[in-house]
Curated annotation (Swiss-Prot):
This is Chaperone protein DnaJ. Its main location: cytoplasm. CXXCXGXG motif repeats lie at residues 149-156, 166-173, 192-199, 206-213. Signal peptide: none annotated. Zn(2+) 2 binds at residues 166, 169, 192, 195. One of its GO terms (biological process) is DNA replication. A zinc finger (CR-type) spans 136-218. Participates actively in the response to hyperosmotic and heat shock by preventing the aggregation of stress-denatured proteins and by disaggregating proteins, also in an autonomous, DnaK-independent fashion. Unfolded proteins bind initially to DnaJ; upon interaction with the DnaJ-bound protein, DnaK hydrolyzes its bound ATP, resulting in the formation of a stable complex. GrpE releases ADP from DnaK; ATP binding to DnaK triggers the release of the substrate protein, thus completing the reaction cycle.
């Protein structure tokens, strides 16, 4: 399903000011927030609104979106890597129309092989504990990636040697090829397979990188994890991808987070949930109970007559929003626990309570014979 235009999502014009964008976002996010709107589809609508605001409220992202739309140059939406298990890191990219045209006609239009090209982007999967994701942290990672060859400094030739005119294409950087196609015999030009379009070849290739200009090494990087990141979210480390070609910029490294669940809380976005068991006397008479929060412990007042399923909301006791939109809430869900083992004295008190409440409790199990006698006696 195609994404809707971000301006359409927020109901604003393409020349809307920042204040108009913010005003539209606040109005719509309040209307479709999952805690307020329980209608089907409200959650997805809220995510769509948040995604649109994240892009349009940022000058650089907005300018890029206005120029390229949803599909470029890096795409938008924060969650760009689905839920797949990446298992470490890998390069990613893809060909455009020119590549398809080239493969079909045996050449066709060719990009300038000597033009600067950005290096490949990489992805790395980082596992975080619940606490690391909530409070942020700094972690050192080790990845294997292509880096500029230290021996030849990316030139590809052995130091002290020079390059010469390519013997295959005579320095043209491309060669003529004739192929049979559905349109008949077609003569096209292709990038020279020997010099890759440079028009030159080495007298002697670099002994370290064998002419590639890059070598694969293990690199250590320090990654600053922001507060409030959630599972499947990612951050971009600009320039930490593969080296560029022909003087082009390096690609980027995308760090995708896998967050382990908490043993204490259940997370839903920026909100967290805590299950609190209370005894029958506490629920009936009321009490003050100490409960955990993300930073410390607080006293929660349980009113008399509290029932199972009652939920208490502690505002802004949740997780800090990763984009800086305040804090989520802490929800405490109550479960009244029925005692399973009672002393004789406790049983007497419970029976007395039942009698005062007008209830008759028969806690003596009867066998089939006794039940049959009472049945025929009309009891």
């Amino acid at each position: 399903m195609a994404k809707r235009d971000y301006y359409e999502v927020l109901g604003i014009s393409k020349d809307a000011s920042k204040d108009e964008i913010k005003k539209a976002y606040r109005k719509l996010s309040k209307k479709y927030h999952p805690d307020i709107n329980k209608e089907e589809g409200a959650d997805e609508k809220f995510k769509e609104i948040s995604e649109a605001y994240e892009v349009l409220s940022d000058d650089n992202k907005r300018a890029s979106y206005d120029q390229f739309g949803h599909d470029g140059p890096q795409g938008f939406g924060g969650q760009g890597f689905n839920g797949s298990d990446f298992g470490g890191f890998s390069g990613f990219g893809g060909g455009g129309f020119e590549d398809i045209f080239s493969s079909f006609f045996g050449g066709g239009r060719q990009r300038d092989p000597n033009a600067p090209q950005k290096g490949d982007d990489l992805q790395y999967t980082m596992t975080l504990t619940f606490e690391e994701a909530v409070f942020g942290t700094t972690k050192e990672i080790s990845i294997r990636k292509d880096v500029t060859c230290e021996t030849c400094h990316g030139d590809g030739a052995k130091p002290g040697t020079s390059k010469k005119t390519c013997s295959y294409c005579n320095g043209a950087g491309h060669v003529a090829v004739e192929q049979n196609t559905i349109l008949g015999r077609v003569r096209t030009e292709q990038v020279c397979p020997k010099c890759n379009g440079s028009g030159q070849e080495f007298e002697e290739a670099c002994p370290t990188c064998h002419g590639k200009g890059t070598e694969n090494k293990t690199v250590k990087l320090e990654v600053k994890v922001p507060e409030g990141v959630d599972n499947e979210q990612q951050i971009r480390l600009a320039g930490e991808g593969s080296p560029g070609v022909n003087g082009g910029p390096a690609g980027d490294l995308y760090v995708v987070f896998r967050v382990k669940p908490s043993e204490t809380f259940k997370r839903d976005g920026d909100d967290i949930y805590y299950k609190l068991n209370v005894s029958f006397p506490q629920a009936a008479l009321g009490d003050e109970i100490k409960i955990p929060t993300l930073n410390n412990e607080v006293m929660l007042t349980i009113p008399a007559g509290t029932q199972t399923g009652k939920q208490f909301r502690l505002k802004e006791k949740g997780i800090k929003n990763v984009h800086g939109y305040g804090y989520g809430d802490l929800y405490v869900d109550i479960k009244v626990v029925t005692p399973t083992k009672l002393t004789d004295r406790q049983k007497e008190l419970m029976k007395e309570f039942a009698q005062l409440n007008g209830e008759e409790i028969n806690d003596q199990p009867s066998n089939f014979k006794d039940r049959a006698k009472r049945f025929f006696k009309g009891e």
